[in-house]
């Protein structure tokens, strides 16, 4: 699976990038038909504490799954986004098995 990591207006350090890849690769254990993923990191509205935004798009057969979460840290936002995607993947996997 190909994992693309992009950031808006800042550079991602290697520690955060490796954490992102690790979390996304764990999703492929749950559902093996993930073709690729795009992760976008943003700093949104710098006047608030919860200004770190993580958007994750998983390309799978049929539809794409998407999650966007905002938090105090990128790590926390990434955790929330991957948790949401786990739920979406489980739901999608159930639909595929019914067909």
Please give the residue ranges for each predicted region:
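N-terminal, polar/charged subdomain of small-to-medium soluble alpha/beta proteins
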Residues: 1-99
């Amino acid at each position: 699976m190909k994992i693309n990591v992009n950031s808006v207006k800042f550079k991602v350090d290697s520690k955060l990038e490796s954490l992102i890849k690790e979390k996304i690769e764990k999703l492929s254990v749950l559902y093996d038909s993930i073709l690729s993923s795009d992760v976008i990191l943003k700093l949104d509205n710098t006047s608030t504490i919860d200004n770190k935004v993580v958007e994750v798009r998983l390309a799978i057969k049929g539809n794409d799954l998407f999650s966007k979460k905002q938090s105090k840290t990128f790590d926390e936002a990434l955790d929330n986004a991957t948790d949401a995607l786990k739920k979406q993947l489980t739901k999608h996997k159930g639909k595929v098995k019914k067909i």
